[in-house]
Amino acid sequence: MSDIEARVKKIIAEQLGVEESQVTNEKAFVADLGADSLDTVELVMALEDEFGIEIPDEDAEKITTVQNAVDYATKNQKA
């Protein structure tokens, strides 16, 4: 697991109040991890803070799974 993947999974677990072991790459935030729309907004904000990036709304709407979040952070992180 890459450092970015580990950081993303930690953020997701903290934001959604689930065990980190439940946060696997194929899990969807809403269907599998019980997130609601406010949770997903807060999750995007936490990812922005962690990785020093800005996620436009049209991109945020496409980040619906753990793998989507890992891929987006990997591609767009500022260092």
Curated annotation (Swiss-Prot):
SUPFAM superfamilies: ACP-like (SSF47336)
Post-translational modification: 4'-phosphopantetheine is transferred from CoA to a specific serine of apo-ACP by AcpS. This modification is essential for activity because fatty acids are bound in thioester linkage to the sulfhydryl of the prosthetic group.
Start and end residues of each Carrier domain: 2-77
Gene that produces this protein: acpP
Transmembrane segments: none
Modified residues (O-(pantetheine 4'-phosphoryl)serine): S37
Highest taxon in the source lineage: Bacteria
InterPro entries (alphabetical): ACP (IPR003231), ACP-like_sf (IPR036736), PKS_PP-bd (IPR020806), PP-bd_ACP (IPR009081), Ppantetheine_attach_site (IPR006162)
Protein name: Acyl carrier protein
